[in-house]
């Protein structure tokens, strides 16, 4: 059945105009964006099936190639889906500009949706002003964290450029285990020492997983 074969009051567009955007299901909202289905399934059915399998959170993390494995989703629709979630991420980032950091939990919340690829390890730098508000965040490196590969110069160069009063470093563990490794502790010690010399305090090193985090400060590991 095509969308045009539905009763007018049951079509997403008409429901949107009549009752407002909040009245639509996630599948109907997605259908408004993707517009057309296949010969076998209308776009609402395609979106319902897609969301029942993946859900919004997992769908947002699928690559273009993975999206195109879904029945009824070709290259153009896959790009539309990626674009929608990217716009959401950017809106989230803008809303958190100048966010004040009071705890490691604030850092964890701030980082939600900011990892380009959760299957790889990323090292982030958060530059803070004198009120502990985030001035800017940067990706410093991608790959396994290693004290021999992460040079303090790269991190503090960015902090100095942004006139940061203090910094927080953040990285993810793709395994989901957020316990600090020996390499994590070595990197933190090096950065703490460099920060003391430059008078730019390392406030914390936070390791994040999908649902939890580890704070060096909260575990009294900053010396």
UniProtKB/Swiss-Prot annotation:
GO molecular function: metal ion binding; metallopeptidase activity
Keyword Zinc on entry: yes
Keywords (A to Z) from UniProt: Hydrolase, Metal-binding, Metalloprotease, Protease, Zinc
Pfam families on file: RadC, UPF0758_N
Motif JAMM motif: positions: 171-184
Binding-site residues for Zn(2+), renumbered to this chain: 171, 173, 184
Span of domain MPN: 100-222
One annotated GO biological process: proteolysis
SUPFAM superfamilies: RuvA domain 2-like
Keyword Protease: yes
Similarity comment: family membership: Belongs to the UPF0758 family.
Protein name (database record): UPF0758 protein Paes_0735
């Amino acid at each position: 059945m095509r969308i045009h074969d539905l009763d007018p009051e049951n079509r997403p567009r008409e429901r949107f105009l009549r009752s407002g955007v909040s009245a639509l299901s996630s599948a109907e909202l997605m259908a408004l964006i993707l517009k057309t289905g296949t010969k076998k399934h209308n776009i609402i059915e395609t979106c319902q099936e897609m969301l029942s399998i993946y859900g919004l959170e997992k769908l947002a993390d699928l690559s273009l190639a993975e999206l195109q494995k879904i029945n009824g989703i070709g290259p153009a629709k896959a790009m539309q889906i990626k674009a929608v979630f990217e716009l959401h991420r950017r809106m989230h980032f803008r809303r958190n500009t100048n966010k004040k950091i009071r705890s490691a939990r604030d850092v964890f919340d701030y980082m939600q949706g900011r990892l380009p690829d959760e299957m790889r390890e990323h090292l982030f730098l958060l530059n803070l002003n004198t009120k502990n508000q985030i001035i800017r965040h940067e990706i410093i490196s991608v790959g396994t964290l290693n004290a021999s590969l992460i040079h303090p110069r790269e991190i503090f160069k960015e902090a100095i450029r942004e006139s940061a009063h203090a910094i927080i470093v953040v990285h993810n563990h793709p395994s989901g285990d957020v316990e600090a490794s020996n390499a994590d502790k070595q990197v933190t010690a090096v950065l703490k020492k460099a920060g003391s010399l430059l008078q730019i305090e390392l406030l914390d090193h936070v390791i994040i997983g999908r649902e939890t985090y580890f704070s060096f400060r909260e575990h009294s590991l900053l010396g």
